[in-house]
């Protein structure tokens, strides 16, 4: 396993209700659909961009 690849732990802390449709789709793309659901993803540029778009709904931790 390559130890040079960083991962981030993302937890949804706020609801997507009342948010724009593209923000809801971004959460689904990250694998999040319920409050307090956590996913661990590779820290790539595409993931960073998605996280930046909905960062107000998430808690982000580096691993």
Swiss-Prot record:
Gene Ontology cellular-component annotations: cytosolic large ribosomal subunit
GO biological process: translation
One Pfam family here: Ribosomal_L30
Transmembrane segments: none
Gene Ontology molecular function, alphabetical: structural constituent of ribosome
Keywords tagged on the record: Ribonucleoprotein, Ribosomal protein
Family designation: Belongs to the universal ribosomal protein uL30 family.
Subunit and partners: Part of the 50S ribosomal subunit.
Protein name: Large ribosomal subunit protein uL30
Gene expressing this chain: rpmD
């Amino acid at each position: 396993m390559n130890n040079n690849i960083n991962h981030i732990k993302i937890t949804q802390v706020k609801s997507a209700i009342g948010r724009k449709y593209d923000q809801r789709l971004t959460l689904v793309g990250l694998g999040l659909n319920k409050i307090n659901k956590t996913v661990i993803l590779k820290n790539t540029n595409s993931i960073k961009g998605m996280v930046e778009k909905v960062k107000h709904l998430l808690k982000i931790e580096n691993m």
